[in-house]
């Protein structure tokens, strides 16, 4: 991999990351193509990355399989100690990791630093959880038997991470696998492979044995994903991305009856009831909608506001949105970075055009901005109805549609009227309403009077077509463990 000065000038320790982890393995090395990674804010070339294929993925799986038995044979304390070292190195080099993240993904540097801290928190959590993998004893039906349950690592894990949180998603998927005693083959998103490589470089310093962590770069993920899903030595796939790709991977895994953890698309409702603290709701909506320029799977995609407070909320919310500065993530005053590519720009423009044609009104923003890069103004659209595309499809950009409602039961039905079920938010003060709405919303995660709810201590995941399984918390570890029942007779 070759890094350019457009990236290294932002780094305190460029030599540490100059040769990022896992250049092609000698068994499959030779003449190969490379793909380019660009800064979406400036268009500058950041790096030339080896473009790997199915043969590389197969070789990585073989290395992971060879390392599986010795890695799982270590004590939980030994695995925990290495995770702790990785955690420490991540924190020591957090500024450089954040700079890499901002350069290749575009998000504001402050958000990038928070993401790196979040990644480190997952490593810390699972370094601790590695020592808490417990079995159980069962009361036997006869005196000559003893019955118990033990938990063992499932084996080699294939992980596929997205571009929108390229550091925290690596840690969230890999750390529980490593804690459980599994080896890993990781395929990072082609738009943002550099921070994953930097994290793996630090993992090498932490002392992970050869073959435990394996990185496969590729400009096109189809061949890599197919090899991970169909190779019988891979026992589990963990994927974060679109529901469409999730369906494809699930089909590819079906012949192997492979265990899967999928965190897929969302269409998150954000509901403001008339008894809500409006100023707090505005703050929460800004967080839930515009973090990472709206490019998050839990981004508020539909903002429902009860009629009695609609005008007040719309005015205060729009006023706040107008203060959000758009630009290069390295500018300390910037709140909204670029969209990831031109396709993302076209989608947000399509959603706005469709809404306006059907009677919506643009209150703020609505245009591309900047002389270069993929920037779009944070946009507020009012008088939105459910028939508009921006209310039915995940926009994945800084576009906030405001929908009016009168009846609480009706808005819950509207919020649930989607194939997705990842995250939902609502603001209210009436305790009876809080409990009823929280239980009625068909989502895996519900934020009540808050616009942010992700934590390493909480189970992250969705229902319906938003995913399978949970990441984070003690529950996230269970997805990497097999339960084995032992029955001892003749006693």
UniProtKB/Swiss-Prot annotation:
- Superkingdom assignment: Bacteria
- Please list the GO biological process terms of this entry: gamma-aminobutyric acid catabolic process
The UniProt GO MF terms for this protein read: succinate-semialdehyde dehydrogenase (NAD+) activity; succinate-semialdehyde dehydrogenase (NADP+) activity
Q: Where is the active site?
A: 263 (proton acceptor), 297 (nucleophile)
Q: Could you list this entry's UniProt keywords, alphabetically sorted.
A: NADP, Oxidoreductase, Plasmid
Supply the EC number(s). 1.2.1.79
* Repressor in keyword set: no
Q: Which InterPro entries match?
A: Ald_DH/histidinol_DH, Ald_DH_C, Ald_DH_CS_GLU, Ald_DH_N, Aldehyde_DH_dom, Aldehyde_DH_Superfamily, Succ_semiAld_DH
Q: What is the role of the protein in this entry? A: Catalyzes the NADP(+) dependent oxidation of succinate semialdehyde to succinate.
Which named protein is this?
Probable succinate-semialdehyde dehydrogenase [NADP(+)]
User: Which species is listed as the source?
Assistant: Sinorhizobium fredii (strain NBRC 101917 / NGR234)
Instruction: Identify the coding gene.
Output: gabD
């Amino acid at each position: 991999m070759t890094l350019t000065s457009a990236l290294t000038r932002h780094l305190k320790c460029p030599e540490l990351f100059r040769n990022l982890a896992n250049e092609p393995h000698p068994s499959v090395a030779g003449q190969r193509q490379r793909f380019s990674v660009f800064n979406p804010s400036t268009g500058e070339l950041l790096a030339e990355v080896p473009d790997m294929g199915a043969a590389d993925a197969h070789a990585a799986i073989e290395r992971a399989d060879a390392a599986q038995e010795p890695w799982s044979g270590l004590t939980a304390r030994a695995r925990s100690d290495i995770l702790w070292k990785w955690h420490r190195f991540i924190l020591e080099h957090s500024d450089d990791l954040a700079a890499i993240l901002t350069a290749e993904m575009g998000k504001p540097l402050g958000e990038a630093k928070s993401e790196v801290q979040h990644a480190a928190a997952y490593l810390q959590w699972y370094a601790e959880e590695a020592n808490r993998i417990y079995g159980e004893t069962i009361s036997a039906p006869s005196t000559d038997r003893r019955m118990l349950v033990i938990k063992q690592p499932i084996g080699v894990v294939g992980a596929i991470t997205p571009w929108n949180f390229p550091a925290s998603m690596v840690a969230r998927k890999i750390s529980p696998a490593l804690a459980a005693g599994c080896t890993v083959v990781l395929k990072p998103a082609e738009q943002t492979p550099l921070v994953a490589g930097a994290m793996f470089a630090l993992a090498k310093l932490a002392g992970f044995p050869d073959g435990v962590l394996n990185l496969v770069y590729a400009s096109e993920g189809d061949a890599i994903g197919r090899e991970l899903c169909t190779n019988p030595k891979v026992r589990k796939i963990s994927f974060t991305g679109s529901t469409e790709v999730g369906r494809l991977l699930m089909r590819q895994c079906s012949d192997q009856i492979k265990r899967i953890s999928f965190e897929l698309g969302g269409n998150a409702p954000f509901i403001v009831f008339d008894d809500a603290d409006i100023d707090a709701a505005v703050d929460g909506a800004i967080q839930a909608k515009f973090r990472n320029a709206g490019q998050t799977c839990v981004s508020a995609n539909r903002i429902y506001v009860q009629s009695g407070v609609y005008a007040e909320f719309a005015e205060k919310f729009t006023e706040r949105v107008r203060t959000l500065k758009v630009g290069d993530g390295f500018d300390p005053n910037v709140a909204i970075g670029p969209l990831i590519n031109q396709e993302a720009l076209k989608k947000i423009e399509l959603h706005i055009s469709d809404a306006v044609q059907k009677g919506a009104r643009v209150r703020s923003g609505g245009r591309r901005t900047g002389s270069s890069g993929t920037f779009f103004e944070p946009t507020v659209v009012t008088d939105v109805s459910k028939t508009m595309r921006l209310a039915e499809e995940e926009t994945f950009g800084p576009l906030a549609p405001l929908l009016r409602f009168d009846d609480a039961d009706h808005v819950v039905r509207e919020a649930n009227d989607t194939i997705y079920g990842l995250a939902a938010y609502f603001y209210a003060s009436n305790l009876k309403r809080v409990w009823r709405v929280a239980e009625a919303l068909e989502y895996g995660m519900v934020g009540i009077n808050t616009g942010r709810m992700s934590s390493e201590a909480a189970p992250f995941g969705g229902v319906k077509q938003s995913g399978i399984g949970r990441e984070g918390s003690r529950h996230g570890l269970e997805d990497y463990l097999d339960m084995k029942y032992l029955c001892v007779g003749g006693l």
